[in-house]
Amino acid sequence: MDTFSTKNLALQAQKKLLSKMASKTVANVFIDDTSSEILDELYRATKEYTHNRKEAQKIIKNLIKIVMKLGVLYRNGQFSPEELLVMERFRKKVHTLAMTAVSFHQIDFTFDRRVVSSVLTECRDLLHQAVSSHLTAKSHSRINHVFNHFADYEFLSALYGPAEPYRTHLKRICEGVNKMLEEDNI
């Protein structure tokens, strides 16, 4: 039986094209202004923490690629009913993460890096589970790269610490996340 399918070919082409084009300019077509501002602040905080512009760019670029590929898969109805259930659990976990991140910022002395790291790790695992049959090993390593960076205890401690410029970055990130929560976009 011939397994050629133009739908599958088009989907592969979209995913390949997105992986080659995941720059901030292209992302602006797919990502709203608030999300873009959050990504900018995550980039600045990551660059400050790693002292490595290229590494910070790579982390954010990988994050953008993941989001864009998820969008392509979802828009093209590629998820099975079981995978859609996992994606719904992932969405709820991301919502919990957003609320937790904002609350830790707003209420002094409540931050616990173990909680944030644990929720990020759960998000990563759910995402792997949902896309296991759709993305390449390279895409799965991108997921690990992004989530492992943001779940790192030392990074979280720096981000939520009292020192500048992290305080300013965190404030702006949380303002954006809070706006997305209010608009029910997360």
Curated annotation (Swiss-Prot):
<dbReference type="GO" id="GO:0042981">
    <property type="term" value="P:regulation of apoptotic process"/>
</dbReference>
<dbReference type="InterPro" id="IPR038355">
    <property type="entry name" value="TNFAIP8_sf"/>
</dbReference>
<dbReference type="GO" id="GO:0032007">
    <property type="term" value="P:negative regulation of TOR signaling"/>
</dbReference>
<keyword id="KW-0963">Cytoplasm</keyword>
<comment type="similarity">
    <text>Belongs to the TNFAIP8 family.</text>
</comment>
<dbReference type="GO" id="GO:0005737">
    <property type="term" value="C:cytoplasm"/>
</dbReference>
<dbReference type="Pfam" id="PF05527">
    <property type="entry name" value="DUF758"/>
</dbReference>
<protein>
    <recommendedName>
        <fullName>Tumor necrosis factor alpha-induced protein 8-like protein 1</fullName>
    </recommendedName>
</protein>
<dbReference type="InterPro" id="IPR008477">
    <property type="entry name" value="TNFAIP8-like"/>
</dbReference>
